[in-house]
């Protein structure tokens, strides 16, 4: 596979237009590792040829396969821990006080392989076990990703031992998963039932998503340019109910937009409240 500078630049432009991801100039190795097998299968010898093939058939399956390969990321259960503790100890109790009798509605944006929305669902179950009857109308979690392949896998709720080992305690494994044969586990139906998976591009219109009380958009914005990041944050704000909360990744910060979000210092961690 050839990754000449001109070919690589063409591919960078294509990927940013397709899904907003801005590849660094030193990411040829990443592109090669993600696309080598696909390009060999298609008989494509360079990134320039790949882009030309996609442009010739912009609605073809090759475009989706390439975007899938470049946006697929494995993640962890209960990543960074604190967001899920803040959710249980601060945000859900506050929601119940301010919205008696209403259903909690959450969005897990760019949910990848599904660990985040299922972790959220487990955290909600843990809250309900400790606070019987308080979340009377229950909760809905809308989980979106650009990758159709990942969403298909997410919906099954099945994971191998390697994925299970990444952040999941034995206690939660025993409580929330059923064994599905050697080295495989499935999320229990009660946890899966809260989660609705949808295909969604963060650059598209947000109108179909509706309004949310809480949005998790963690470890996603680092892949976008500053302008695209700002645009996405403004769009997310449009989906948040007044006073709703945005959770970003531990290494991400919301710089700017003081008219839209207020920083809330938790212990530990930081979240953002919609004005």
From Swiss-Prot:
Disruption phenotype: Mutants are deficient in chemotaxis toward malate and casamino acids. Mutation does not affect biofilm formation. Keywords: Chemotaxis, Methyltransferase, S-adenosyl-L-methionine, Transferase. This is Chemotaxis protein methyltransferase Cher2. It catalyses: L-glutamyl-[protein] + S-adenosyl-L-methionine = [protein]-L-glutamate 5-O-methyl ester + S-adenosyl-L-homocysteine. One of its GO terms (biological process) is chemotaxis. Pfam families: CheR (PF01739), CheR_N (PF03705). S-adenosyl-L-methionine binds at residues 73, 75, 79, 116, 145, 201-202, 218-219. It comes from Pseudomonas putida (strain ATCC 47054 / DSM 6125 / CFBP 8728 / NCIMB 11950 / KT2440). Gene3D superfamilies: Chemotaxis receptor methyltransferase CheR, N-terminal domain, Vaccinia Virus protein VP39. Monomer. PROSITE patterns: CHER. It comes from the Bacteria. Residues 1-275 form the CheR-type methyltransferase domain. Signal peptide: none annotated. It is an enzyme of class 2 (transferase). GO terms for molecular function: protein-glutamate O-methyltransferase activity. Methylation of the membrane-bound methyl-accepting chemotaxis proteins (MCP) to form gamma-glutamyl methyl ester residues in MCP. Methylates the McpS chemotaxis receptor. InterPro entries: Bact_Chemotaxis_MeTrfase, Chemotaxis_MeTrfase_CheR, CheR_C, CheR_MeTrfase, CheR_N, CheR_N_sf, SAM-dependent_MTases_sf. Its EC number is 2.1.1.80.
């Amino acid at each position: 596979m050839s990754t000449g500078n001109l070919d690589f630049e063409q591919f960078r432009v294509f990927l940013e237009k397709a899904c907003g991801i801005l590849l660094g100039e030193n990411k040829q190795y990443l592109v090669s590792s993600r696309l080598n097998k696909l390009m060999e299968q298609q008989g494509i010898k360079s990134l320039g040829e790949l882009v030309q093939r996609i442009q010739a058939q912009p609605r073809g399956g090759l475009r989706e396969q390439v975007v899938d390969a470049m946006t697929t990321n494995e993640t962890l259960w209960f990543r960074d821990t604190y967001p899920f503790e803040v959710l249980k100890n601060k945000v859900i109790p506050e929601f119940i006080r301010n919205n008696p009798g209403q259903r909690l509605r959450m969005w897990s944006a760019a949910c990848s392989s599904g660990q985040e929305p299922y972790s959220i669902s487990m955290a909600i179950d843990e809250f309900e076990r400790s606070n019987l009857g308080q979340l009377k109308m229950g909760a809905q979690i809308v989980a979106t990703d650009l990758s159709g392949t990942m969403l298909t896998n997410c919906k099954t709720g099945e994971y191998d031992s390697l994925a299970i080992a990444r952040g999941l305690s034995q206690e939660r494994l025993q409580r929330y998963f059923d064994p599905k044969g050697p080295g495989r586990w499935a999320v229990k139906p009660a946890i899966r039932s809260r989660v609705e998976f949808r295909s969604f591009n963060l650059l598209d219109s947000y109108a179909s998503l509706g309004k949310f009380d809480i949005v998790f958009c963690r470890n996603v914005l680092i892949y976008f340019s500053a302008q695209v990041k700002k645009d996405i944050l403004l769009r997310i704000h449009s989906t948040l109910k007044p006073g709703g909360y945005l959770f970003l990744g531990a290494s991400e910060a919301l710089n700017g937009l003081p008219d839209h979000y207020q920083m809330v210092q938790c212990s530990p961690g930081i979240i953002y409240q919609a004005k």
